[in-house]
Design a protein with these regions (language model features):
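A short glycine-enriched loop-to-beta-strand structural element that forms part of the catalytic core
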Residues: 36, 67-88, 110-140
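Active-site-proximal alpha-helical element of nucleotidyl cyclase-like catalytic domains
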Residues: 17-20, 43-68, 104
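Active-site-proximal structural segments of metal-dependent nucleotidyl cyclase/transferase enzymes
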Residues: 17-47
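PLD/PLD-like phosphodiesterase catalytic module centered on the HKD motif
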Residues: 150-322
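Short helix/loop segment flanking the catalytic signature motif in cyclic-nucleotide metabolism enzymes
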Residues: 45-52, 80-100
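Catalytic-core segments of nucleotide cyclases and related cyclic-nucleotide turnover enzymes
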Residues: 14-21, 91-106, 122-149
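Flexible, glycine/charge-rich interdomain/linker segments that couple
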Residues: 2-8, 115-130, 143-168
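Short coupling/linker segments associated with nucleotidyl cyclase/phosphodiesterase signaling modules
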Residues: 3-25
Length: 322
């Protein structure tokens, strides 16, 4: 097996990556641990040109010394792809790695007409061997390119720009749709509260599964319905954050983390962002008039993760996930 460039680059060819991936699968199965892969898809296929080596070097520099990086030739005429193998890394650890990689590769996107998609898969939840993980990650590339996050170019917009666009644009479909809620409508003005309770109830059915939930309303209070649901759920691995204007009883909230924000836009918007290993869900409701709300909801995991990333970044909340 050969390296395509200087030995100290730690950037390997496809043959080496495939062999190492098979070995990592055997090791993880033997020791009952996990590992993940990140597949980096660069479009258009010839767009990287002479900066491909620079992109590869940036990826190697961004990941850990124990991670293995190399070129992954497409089997069906895909463009140039880079693959990173992340030993002992779970789903949420992989998302944090992708955030770091995205920041490292941003300069290449601004200087050239490139589109870079980060896909991923984790052993054993997404496959029992390296080949299955790679197939899963390759399918996810196509799904991510079809996501609203990519189609509307939301990565380059501010958080509240995105919120305004999603809540004011009509969407219809299985993954993304718009609806109205409020007084006199089939869905009540308490729809967001009800959605939050349903998510907590779902999390309680698999309490060991990690997740992250942001729920934003005008004011944080110990009387919020979701807190009662959390109390009944017991210990769950989903981390719950309540966002809004801080009230006098914040110290009474024991089973969620208050995030006090004195932002007037939270008087107009309420939202839920929920991301777990298995699914993602977001609902955004914007107050209109007469106790009615214009709402948008989605099960697009890439869009949900993007919204969480934007929200955490613009309010300096750190890069915590589940």
């Amino acid at each position: 097996m050969r390296r395509p460039a200087a030995a100290d680059r730690r950037f390997y060819d496809t043959e080496f990556i495939r062999s190492y991936g098979r070995i990592e699968s055997l090791r993880a199965a033997r020791y009952n641990t996990c590992y993940s892969i990140v597949l980096i898809d660069i479009a258009p296929p010839d767009g990287a040109g002479d900066v491909y080596d620079d992109i590869a070097d940036a990826v190697v520099s961004a990941v850990r010394s124990c991670d293995v990086t190399g070129e992954m030739d497409g089997e069906h005429g895909e463009g140039r792809r880079i693959l990173v193998i992340l030993p002992e890394t779970d789903f949420f650890g992989t998302l944090l790695t992708i955030r770091k990689l995205s920041k490292s590769l941003d300069p290449f996107l601004s200087s050239r007409a490139l589109s870079i998609i980060f896909s991923h898969a984790t052993f054993p939840r997404d496959g029992k061997g390296f080949g299955e993980l790679l197939s899963r990650a390759a399918r996810l590339v196509a799904q991510k390119r079809a996501s609203l996050w990519e189609r509307l170019n939301l990565k380059d917009k501010l958080f509240w720009e995105i919120m305004g666009e999603l809540s004011s644009t009509p969407f219809s479909g299985f993954a993304n749709s718009s609806f109205d809620a409020g007084s006199g409508l089939p869905l009540s003005e308490f729809f967001v509260d009800q959605a939050g309770e349903l998510i907590v109830n779902e999390a309680s059915r698999s309490p060991q599964k990690r997740g992250i939930l942001y729920m934003a309303s005008r004011k944080i209070s110990s009387s919020l319905p979701i807190l009662k649901s959390l109390g009944l759920a017991g210990n769950v691995a989903t981390r719950v954050f309540l966002v809004g204007e801080g009230g006098p009883d914040l110290q009474e909230i024991k089973n969620a983390t208050p995030v006090p924000l004195a932002d007037p836009r939270l008087k107009e918007f309420s939202f839920i962002f929920f991301l777990s290993e298995d699914s993602g869900y977001a609902v955004i409701c914007r107050e209109c008039w007469g106790d009615t709300f214009s709402c948008f909801h989605t099960s697009d995991q890439m869009l949900v993760e993007g919204l969480i990333t934007k929200f955490q970044g613009e309010y300096a909340l750190g890069e915590q996930l589940g």
